[in-house]
From Swiss-Prot:
PANTHER family: PERIPLASMIC NITRATE REDUCTASE, ELECTRON TRANSFER SUBUNIT. One of its GO terms (biological process) is anaerobic respiration. Residues 40-65 are annotated as: Disordered. It comes from Bradyrhizobium japonicum. The keyword Membrane does not apply. This is Periplasmic nitrate reductase, electron transfer subunit. Residues 1-34 form the signal peptide. Electron transfer subunit of the periplasmic nitrate reductase complex NapAB. Receives electrons from the membrane-anchored tetraheme c-type NapC protein and transfers these to NapA subunit, thus allowing electron flow between membrane and periplasm. Essential for periplasmic nitrate reduction with nitrate as the terminal electron acceptor. GO terms for molecular function: metal ion binding.
Amino acid sequence: MRRAHRAGERVMMKRFGIALLAVAIAAGASSLTAQTVTSGLHGPAPLNDEGPAPPMLPNRNTSEREVRNYPEQPPVIPHTIDGYQVDLNGNKCLSCHARARTAESQAPMVSITHFMDRDGQFWPSISPRRFFCTECHVPQNTATPPVSNDFTDIDTLLSRASPGGRR
């Protein structure tokens, strides 16, 4: 008789423990949804709300070429490209950057890699997979970074690593 009574107590304790755990989980979940967590990038709006969009800042519009930060980085676009057509019907970028137009426009020529297909074969014109410039090349705007950045470019890293700062 005592064994049956103890077994019944154990079952009741297990059920009580499970019920208590369920109540604790529910209370914790409801307190999490009530909190507003803020992030430097998201702003003061609650995470499940969409805050107002930040204002669009003007693009830099200069003829200066920017230094690349790492090898093989696509060059950034130093001028505005508002209204440029870059689609299946045409590519406004090539009116200055095409091989035949660079002498007249004084713009840098499209890289020779843009004339290669995925098999390494050269084409007489831009490879279709490189036709849409803005997939890799982007204009730069005047925004201040929303978070601090201590990025160091490759040349600086290499000069620190070499004796005497030389490469």
